[in-house]
Amino acid sequence: MAGHSKWANIKHRKGAQDALKAKIFNKFSKEIMVAVAKGGSDPNSNPALRLIISKARAKSMPKSNIEKAIAKGEGSTSNGENFKEIIYSGTLSHGISVIVVILTDNINRAIASLQALFRRANGQIGKQNSIPYLFEQKGYLEIEKNNLDEDDLMLFCLDNGAEDFQSDGENYMIYCQPRKISELKNEIEKKFSPNFRAVEISYFPNEWVELDQENTEKILNQIDNFLDDEDIQNVYHNLKFA
């Protein structure tokens, strides 16, 4: 029975991980389709597509999935699958500010779902396409340390447009202006050939809010509920947690 229970737990964890991967890949697929529809299917002449492909590869999205999304993007206008991006700000309980990025083919459905999510979280939805002063948009690169020399990489990044360079136990984190991210990523790749864990343009808070463990978990669960929605691509917040 113990062995059966262990196998059941492993199966459950693997199922949850597979479901999470599928959800992440689906979000990337939508971003790729939008980028292709706007700027064409050639990453060399479409920097937005090039960046999204880099993000997807950093999260181990299979090449076949990327190619399918590009093909769907090329036919998106003819088959009516047109996605639009909208951004909403808002607040959750305890003064937590959020930015919600939506990518949807049905704006009315997406907004109705978003309003319901804020109500359930005892939060308040803000204005569309209004970014609160608490957040700043930056390019973000995360690289596995492996055997990379920290000083060499840091100096190279700062010489090539990076604004900040940080490290933790396993990774280097590099910040830059959004317009610099593709160029900086390409220069790092040519020089060091590292393993990128993240390549993205994100919103970073200028001020953090720290809560006790119980309320932190409640807010994180609320954010997870937002991310479970099929139309929500990302949620940025100013909750500080260990």
UniProtKB/Swiss-Prot annotation:
A single GO cellular-component term on record: cytosol
Signal peptide: none
NCBIfam families according to UniProt: PRK00110.1, PRK12378.1, YebC/PmpR family DNA-binding transcriptional regulator
Main location per the UniProt record: cytoplasm
Subcellular location(s) of the protein: Cytoplasm
Annotated family: Belongs to the TACO1 family.
Record keywords, A-Z: Cytoplasm, DNA-binding, Transcription, Transcription regulation
InterPro entries registered for this protein in UniProt: Integrase-like_N, TACO1_YebC-like_2nd/3rd_dom, TACO1_YebC_N, Transcrip_reg_TACO1-like, Transcrip_reg_TACO1-like_dom3, YebC-like
GO biological process, one term: regulation of DNA-templated transcription
A single GO molecular function term of this UniProt record: DNA binding
Stated name of the protein: Probable transcriptional regulatory protein MHP7448_0474
Domain of life from the UniProt record: Bacteria
Species: Mesomycoplasma hyopneumoniae (strain 7448) (Mycoplasma hyopneumoniae)
